[in-house]
Amino acid sequence: MDHHLLEIIACPICNGKLHFDKKNLELICQTDELAYPISNGIPVLLESHARDLSSLEKK
């Protein structure tokens, strides 16, 4: 994931910072406890496509 892109995109719900999860190829919003998928290198920042973080991932 391009570090410059991570600096300019934000969570569509809270406008908070997103963190790249390299293992799962997702962008994580810790504030809303959501993970957004990356499909073919493109972040899918739609709430309907996000998944809730598990209790282990929230730590």
Swiss-Prot record:
One Pfam assignment: Trm112p
Coiled coil: none
Any Gene Ontology CC annotation: cytosol
InterPro entries found in the cross-reference section: Trm112-like
Family the UniProt entry places it in: Belongs to the UPF0434 family.
Name assigned to this protein: UPF0434 protein HDEF_0234
